[in-house]
Amino acid sequence: MKKFIETLKNCWKIEDLRQRLLITLLFTAIYRFGSFVVLPGINPSMLEKLQSQTSGGLMSLLDMFSGGAFSNASIFALGIMPYISASIVMQLLAVAVPYFQKMQREGESGRKKIQWYTRVLTVAILVFQAPSYLLNLKMQAANALATGISWTVFMIPATIILAAGSMFILWLGERITDKGVGNGISLIIMIGIIARLPQAFVQEVTSRLQAISSGGLIMFIVEILILYAVVCASILLVQGTRKIPVQYAKRLVGNKQYGGARQYIPLKLFAANVMPIIFAQALMFIPLAIVRYQSENASTVVQQLMDNRSLLYNVVYVILVIAFTYFYTAITLNPTQMAEDMKRNNGFIPGVKPGKDTAEYIDTVMSRITLPGSLFIAFIAIMPALAGLLDVQQAFSQFFGGTSLLILVGVVIDSLQQIESHLLMRHYDGLLNSGHTRQGGVAAY
């Protein structure tokens, strides 16, 4: 523990890392503050019905992603999900449409163009989602407006504020990515999830203590043990890698010999990280948009897709998670490009011919590790529904797996790795190691 505290002190000694940590804390604090700023014209005391509506089902998950901003009718009520939806569409277009395929191969300039299109599409989605949210608010809490304000007058400025709030969250996320620590978008989602954890934990403890005579305390201990096991399994999933050995040919430059060393290509078991589950969850929110307009006439199928504990919801969810895992892995890792880079640098995989055979070998290995990875991630994704079989409270069950847990684990590990890289670059031990200053690559004790 002493070494860990010393390492935290080392984080503060590095000026660049200190600034990044402070910027991250500042922007996340701004995001949390905005989650409590209610839309102008709304009477917060009249939102009980909207908050009760988000206490269960898929609406509760959407509210958790926004850190409670959805049920508070805040300026950040739509959260970051419109941007996630736009990203899904652009990822699909980058695979299916030649124009975007070419753009994706243009490197940094192409990435900036795709990012611009993603922002434009985000605005288009917000033009639809903001009025949809306000119509739902009107149905659930028609008397939520302050005295003297009509819904007709309220709709247009409120739509602009909601859209601007969501775009501001996107801006915060991008600034955190550029100037802070970790992936800003994922970090903002994680902050929203963590904000709901204390309340969910208290509700679960209270519920179990009330049933202490019927074994409630024992069940709570069992829940914590299961939660611990699931967290450990999730960490192994995120960190698991398959190393492919690469041998580099020896070459003589002057009187010095270079190359000849064996290195490894670390293919992650879950190369797509948390993106497939975020994308799948974003698509599962589509039934909400349908029901907002015709809640009474919604079909049984749509109603089941809104219940994150129903069989249909979880079957569709598993299929989407597996599909997005393969899809995102395919667009993230390019075996052909990896094989070409290896050949260009006089590298080869022992026993495999350079070029096409190497690309096929890497692709085969990727397919073999992606299948178990996608199945395991799908199992983790439906763990909240399985936790419901143990009568775990709806809010607390979300932390047993699924989107919430994987985002928490993935974002924390990603942020720690970035902090670790800053420490190692400046000759300190990593965050999870001893914390002593290194000199010339050797720890100084």
Name the predicted role of every residue range.
Residues 1-104, 109-445:
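N-terminal cationic and glycine-rich segments that engage phosphates or anionic surfaces
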